[in-house]
Amino acid sequence: MNYKENTLCYEEYCKLRESVGWINFSRTQTEKSLQNSLYTVAAEEDNQVVGMGRLIGDGMYYMIVDIVVQPAYQQMGIGSKILNMIIEYVDSATPDGGRSSIQLIAEKGKETFYESRGFKIIPHEFCGSGMRKVIRK
């Protein structure tokens, strides 16, 4: 398995989302989002992208989005490797004496995957519930 940084393209992105039943966004919106990502990881096997993850943020607050592994390749450590690479990126970008916060929205049923890697379900002792608003046109 090869892991490539910052090479994720529109076609690979859409194919991976479709492989897990996620709806794709418009090409224009997706290409802009990929360009504006701080960091992307693509897992490649036999010249085929089988997993991905993206990081967005501002240098203090980060959000992990689009962690996807094709179903046939799940339970092989690919998602863990992608997540670890993203966390390492944030760690290396955090200055000495600084602090960074990483958020994500786990797919239902995948919460324990993230909990086992140090993420906490919110609300907890320091945070209220996470929220989101979707705008459709």
Identify the role of each PLM range.
Residues 1-27:
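Short amphipathic alpha-helix that is part of the acyltransferase structural core
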Residues 8-11, 59, 108-112:
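Short alpha-helical
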Residues 17-44:
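Active-site rim helix/loop that mediates acceptor-substrate recognition in acyltransferases
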Residues 38-40, 80, 87, 131-137:
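Accessory recognition modules or surfaces
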Residues 42, 48-56, 61-63, 68:
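Conserved beta-strand in the GNAT
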Residues 69, 75-89:
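Conserved acetyl-CoA-binding loop-helix of GNAT-fold acetyltransferases
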Residues 91-127, 133:
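Conserved active-site alpha-helix within GNAT-family acetyltransferase domains
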